[in-house]
């Protein structure tokens, strides 16, 4: 039975801080139909609630998308530099009558911003959750916006068949695929309900997992001892049916894709090769020699090439994603490991564990432009719009490299912060998954400290 939504929606416009001047707190009514608009101080806020049901009808207990559009009233253009905050809560009739509805709503927003566990709205539209991979056979769900005694609240715990190793999620974050090497399977977690929904057979010793850009297929690296079982298993990401196993070579496998999802590139560490797989037919197209010990592989959308870092040879081999041939070999130093690219594909950062440094490659001309000192034994790197964040195994410090400071003839700007009391190495064996996660606004990262489980 269809039910209209008749609760109040409090909208608070934030400039660069929660206390920014000119903030407007208003209550809006929505009956689940059309678009509601609020116009004030030259700003238009449009609210739309859209059912996710196939028939488009809003029903109690079902999912819906709540969308806000904030525009300049005069020009109709999107308003820059604001961060909307919104809460859904039952209308407080007595408070509205006593204070006036606007002041009543504003006072409640002030309470909600304190993130007290005893004063929460019916629905916090700004909320998000963090999933934390544990070393035992489980995944924890944390609410970072609610704390008890200064410690963030654990919302749920999801039990798995075996300890996890790596994970990946599609853009809509509705599922999480988790590799379990000891179970020869990939766990599928429903991240809307925080429960395990399936375990899919994924070949022998599944470790690395990756979704191709169009998210149609899930690729699983099989670090199997038997040559015929070492390679990748391909799974349909929607039906969860295994489609094919492709033997590629011996050793650990890293996986990258062309931007158009036509080619998959799989490194074979012990064979010193990269296998190129045609995704349409799921057949091996080419096998390239890329050094003695390829440890990482990354794709640049700017140069339309794949970069393969070899730890033993100290080289980065550039493979053209169109011609599928080696375009250049960049000579660096022994000890190379993980590599990644900035979102625009311009700057590639490859970590050197032996030298405690990060080498920066400019993808516009495939050349080395910087060597930057970073945290001891760097082993993980992630990117936001503005920074590269680098985690070291032998240091509690996380290094930040300012991407805007990079370029030929320029001096890189770096800084750091402590992420816990001790270095990650002291925690013992760690999962392959990154301990760094980019925040949803792409302006910060969350850092896990495996030593004290924070």
Residue ranges and their predicted role:
Residues 6-9, 384:
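Short helix-onset patch at the extreme N-terminus, typifying the N->h transition
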Residues 1-4:
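N-terminal secretory signal peptides that target proteins for export/translocation
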Residues 25-454:
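Predominantly soluble domains enriched in secretory-pathway, periplasmic, or organellar proteins
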Residues 8-20:
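Bacterial N-terminal signal peptides
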């Amino acid at each position: 039975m269809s039910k209209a939504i008749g609760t109040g929606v409090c909208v608070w416009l934030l400039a660069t801080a929660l206390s920014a001047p000119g903030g407007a707190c208003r209550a809006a009514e929505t009956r689940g139909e059309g678009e509601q608009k609020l116009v004030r101080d030259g700003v238009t806020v449009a609210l739309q609630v859209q059912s996710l049901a196939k028939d488009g009808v809003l029903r109690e207990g079902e999912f819906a998308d709540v969308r806000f559009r904030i525009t300049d009233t005069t020009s109709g253009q999107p308003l820059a530099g604001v961060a909307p905050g919104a809460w859904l809560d039952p209308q407080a009739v007595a408070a509205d009558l006593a204070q006036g509805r606007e002041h009543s709503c504003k006072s409640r927003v002030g309470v909600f911003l304190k993130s007290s566990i005893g004063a929460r709205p019916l629905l916090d539209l700004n909320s998000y959750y963090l999933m934390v991979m544990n070393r035992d056979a489980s995944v924890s769900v944390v609410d970072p916006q609610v704390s008890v005694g200064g410690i963030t609240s654990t919302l749920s715990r999801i039990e798995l068949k075996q300890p996890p190793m790596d994970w990946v999620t599609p853009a809509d974050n509705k599922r999480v695929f988790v590799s379990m090497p000891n179970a020869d399977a990939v766990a599928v977690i429903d991240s809307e309900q925080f429960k395990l929904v399936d375990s899919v057979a994924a070949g022998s010793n599944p470790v690395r997992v990756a979704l191709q850009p169009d998210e149609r297929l899930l690729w699983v690296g099989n670090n199997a001892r038997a040559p015929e079982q070492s390679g990748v298993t391909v799974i349909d990401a929607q039906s969860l049916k295994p489609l094919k196993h492709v033997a590629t070579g011996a050793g650990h496998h890293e996986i990258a894709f062309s931007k158009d999802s036509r080619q998959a590139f799989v490194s074979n560490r012990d064979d010193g090769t990269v296998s190129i797989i045609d995704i349409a037919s799921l057949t091996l197209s080419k096998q390239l020699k890329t050094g003695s010990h390829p440890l990482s592989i990354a794709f640049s959308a700017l140069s339309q090439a794949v970069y393969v870092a070899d730890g033993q040879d100290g080289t980065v081999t550039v493979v053209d994603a169109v011609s599928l041939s080696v375009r250049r070999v960049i000579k660096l130093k022994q000890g190379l490991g993980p590599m990644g690219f900035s979102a625009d594909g311009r700057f590639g950062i490859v970590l050197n564990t032996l030298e405690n440094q990060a080498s920066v490659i400019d993808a516009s001309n495939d050349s080395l432009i910087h060597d930057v000192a970073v945290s001891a034994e760097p082993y993980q790197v992630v990117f936001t719009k503005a920074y590269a964040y680098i985690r070291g195994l032998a240091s509690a410090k996380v290094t930040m490299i300012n991407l805007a400071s990079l370029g030929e003839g320029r001096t890189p700007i770096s800084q750091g912060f402590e992420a816990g009391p001790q270095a990650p190495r002291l925690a013992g064996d760690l999962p392959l998954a990154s301990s760094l996660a980019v925040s949803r606004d792409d302006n910060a990262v969350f850092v896990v400290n495996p030593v004290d489980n924070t």
